[in-house]
Amino acid sequence: MGQSHSKGNSGPGDSLQSYPSFSRSDTKESLRSLRGSIRSKIRSSDSPRGSTAGLSDDKSDAASVKSTTSRRSSTNQSVQSPDDTPSQPDAPEPPPSPSLSSSLKRGHKDVNAMQQSGEVDHVSDVPPTGAAPTGPSTQKVGESILIKRENQLNPILDFIMNAPLETSGSPGMGMGALKSIDLDDMISRLLDAGYSTKVTKTVCLKNAEIMAICSAARELFLSQPALLELSAPVKIVGDVHGQYTDLIRLFEMCGFPPASNYLFLGDYVDRGKQSLETILLLLCYKLKYPENFFLLRGNHECANVTRVYGFYDECKRRCNIKIWKTFIDTFNCLPIAATVAGKIFCVHGGLSPSLSHMDDIRGIARPTDVPDYGLLNDLLWSDPADMEEDWEPNERGVSYCFGKKVIMNFLQRHDFDLVCRAHMVVEDGYEFYQDRILVTVFSAPNYCGEFDNWGAIMSVSGELLCSFELLKPLDSTALKNHIKKGRKERNSMLSSPVSPPLLRFVVAKEDHNLFVQHRRDACGLFLAYPSLVTSWGISR
């Protein structure tokens, strides 16, 4: 895990706010304590506990649930922070995540060389066509990929389920009133905001609408298990970190929902300039397509982390602190991990010494904050590493690093073929770990305007062939030009006169936000050769 910066070509105007560059000093507070490394960067008067204390007397706030066991227990209820929080410096330090891969030292791979070696089958500015062995998908658009099981373990804290969901006193915007037509309008406004290329002082949605979205999403997350079991095909997305225009580029390249099924691995907020639009669009798509669009929890979907690294400040500046608190309540309900076709284990961070059975994940009671230690902490924070030992303290200052033997034993024990995770900046957007037993996917290109990294999305076909689609790193000027072109195409499609039958089709597409999937300034990279599929054993 190297620490060198990429050869970024962007100017200082591209970097986020005033956050400095990454350094190892961010993570040397303690060995495995999440709050140990976070608290030193938070003023006592601005701690998440202090920020929410005066907002409401509602005791259902999941972020304030006290732990009933010891700190080293693997339970996943939160442990309250002490009151004597150390002072925070005026300029917040960068987050202890994502870590930087050693690929950032080596530079981008030579795509031509990769093609000659057989690793890359297709590189183009348009989708793979003709003989590309993707295989036809038998799944219909909008068909559920969520595998449901009777009497599935899914513990929910009773006092949370019995508590009324807060809607900011707006009777017309309760969860029952959040209808499909409301979601369509909200999605349209959010996309309009993205295509405008402007970061506005306020959000395009009203506070009452944001509260309603969060309340509905909260209940939906709790209705689905903490360990999602999904079928293929699906596109797996890594860290996004508030890079809203890049998220729109991602949907342009891979297909707006429900044309494609999606599984996001977490880290939707912090660092980027438009975390609010990013998480709101994702939540709206989750509500619109609940069994085709899935969001896992990342280590940044946490009160303490968002308080330090940007999202709290953005909510306070553009909405209010109560909106931030509502998002935290929603984050505390997110699912933790997922499996794809019973062969690919997906999680934000990595593995845990506390994980012996998949029921350990299913048994995580929600809503829950991220505890100091234990299973949930490790799943969101741990990293793979080239080392002889099975486990060792993570240099982030939180959780562990794990070696090849741990991964191999995990795959064999649970009959998986691949671990797919995010949580780490990698130069080419994706990076395999030894013998392709684990892959890191990072989907925020030109991360923070500081790294010249690509963004990647891993596509898993119905036949379990794995491919990667890449988002080219663009500086702020190139990104604006790209979005303007996309806006023109979108407006042209929406305003073009069509015959009645085609009009009905276009209306249906607009209803599902299926706009033209152009891949300008993006690269489709396809990995599908027999030896790869055979070595993974990813087959029916």
From Swiss-Prot:
Residue ranges annotated as compositionally biased, kind Polar residues, are 15-24, 45-54
Which regions are flagged for Pro residues bias?
A: 89-98
Instruction: Please note every region of biased composition (Low complexity).
Output: 62-88, 127-136
> What's a single GO CC term here?
fungal-type vacuole
Q: Where in the cell is it found?
A: Cytoplasm
Q: Where is Mn(2+) 2 bound in this sequence?
A: D267, N299, H348, H423
Tell me how the cofactor is bound.
Binds 2 manganese ions per subunit.
Gene inactivation phenotype reads: Reduces sidC and sidG expression, slightly increases gliotoxin production, decreases growth in iron starvation conditions and leads to reduced conidiation at 44 degrees Celsius. Reduces the production of pyripyropene A, fumagillin, fumiquinazoline A, triacetyl-fusarinine C, and helvolic acid. Abolishes virulence in a neutropenic murine model of invasive pulmonary aspergillosis.
Q: Which residues are catalytic?
A: H300
Q: Which UniProt keywords apply?
A: Cytoplasm, Hydrolase, Manganese, Metal-binding, Protein phosphatase
What SUPFAM superfamilies does this protein's entry cite?
Metallo-dependent phosphatases
Q: Which reaction does this enzyme catalyse, per its entry? A: O-phospho-L-seryl-[protein] + H2O = L-seryl-[protein] + phosphate; O-phospho-L-threonyl-[protein] + H2O = L-threonyl-[protein] + phosphate
GO molecular-function terms, A-Z: metal ion binding; protein serine/threonine phosphatase activity
Domain Phosphatase tensin-type as annotated: residue spans: 258-540
The positions annotated for binding Mn(2+) 1 are D239, H241, D267
State the EC number(s).
3.1.3.16
Q: Which cofactor does it need?
A: Mn(2+)
Region (Disordered) location: 1-108, 120-140
Give the family, as the similarity comment puts it: Belongs to the PPP phosphatase family. PP-Z subfamily.
Instruction: State what this protein does.
Output: Catalytic subunit of protein phosphatase Z (PPZ) involved in iron assimilation. Regulates secondary metabolites production, including gliotoxin, pyripyropene A, fumagillin, fumiquinazoline A, triacetyl-fusarinine C, and helvolic acid. Plays a key role in pathogenicity.
Oligomeric state and partners?
A: Interacts with at least 54 proteins, of which 31 are detected only after iron starvation and 22 are detected only in control conditions. Only the regulatory subunit of the protein phosphatase PP1 (Afu1g04800/AFUB_005140) interacts with ppzA in both conditions.
Q: What name does UniProt use for this protein? A: Serine/threonine-protein phosphatase ppzA
**Gene for this chain:** ppzA
